[in-house]
Amino acid sequence: MKIEVNKNLIKHLENLSLIQLSQNEEKMLENDITNIIKFFEKINELDLSNVEPLFHPLPQGRLRKDTPRDPLDRENALKNVKRKENGYIVGPRTYGE
């Protein structure tokens, strides 16, 4: 799949990111994204048919067993929370006022 990097894509990314870029920044971002995509296209051209898969140095990951356990009750869950309201945790605003 070929991604076309153009002004419309940059504007779309600005909207998704909730940022505004100057024309100079837009042009720089367009060039950067184009270079990144070209780099990945070069990687995709590599012939890896004779390359063996990598191994992990440890026989098993350091993840804990996922064993079910009883959840915290509401009182204990809210015990150390700074901001709570009506039994819910109040987080910081992320957008708007």
UniProtKB/Swiss-Prot annotation:
GO BP field: glutaminyl-tRNAGln biosynthesis via transamidation; regulation of translational fidelity; translation
GO molecular function: asparaginyl-tRNA synthase (glutamine-hydrolyzing) activity; ATP binding; glutaminyl-tRNA synthase (glutamine-hydrolyzing) activity
UniProt keyword list: ATP-binding, Ligase, Nucleotide-binding, Protein biosynthesis
Complex formation: Heterotrimer of A, B and C subunits.
Coiled-coil stretches: none
Chain residue ranges for the region called Disordered: 58-78
Keyword Disulfide bond: no
Protein family per UniProt: Belongs to the GatC family.
Function: Allows the formation of correctly charged Asn-tRNA(Asn) or Gln-tRNA(Gln) through the transamidation of misacylated Asp-tRNA(Asn) or Glu-tRNA(Gln) in organisms which lack either or both of asparaginyl-tRNA or glutaminyl-tRNA synthetases. The reaction takes place in the presence of glutamine and ATP through an activated phospho-Asp-tRNA(Asn) or phospho-Glu-tRNA(Gln).
Comp. bias intervals (Basic and acidic residues): 63-77
Biological classification of the source: Archaea, Thermoproteota, Thermoprotei, Sulfolobales, Sulfolobaceae
Stated name of the protein: Aspartyl/glutamyl-tRNA(Asn/Gln) amidotransferase subunit C
Gene source species: Saccharolobus islandicus (strain L.S.2.15 / Lassen #1) (Sulfolobus islandicus)
InterPro entries hit by this protein: Asp/Glu-ADT_sf_sub_c, GatC
EC identifiers of the protein: 6.3.5.-
Alphabetical list of HAMAP family matching this protein: GatC
Reaction(s) this enzyme catalyzes, per UniProt: L-glutamyl-tRNA(Gln) + L-glutamine + ATP + H2O = L-glutaminyl-tRNA(Gln) + L-glutamate + ADP + phosphate + H(+); L-aspartyl-tRNA(Asn) + L-glutamine + ATP + H2O = L-asparaginyl-tRNA(Asn) + L-glutamate + ADP + phosphate + 2 H(+)
Protein's gene: gatC
Source superkingdom: Archaea
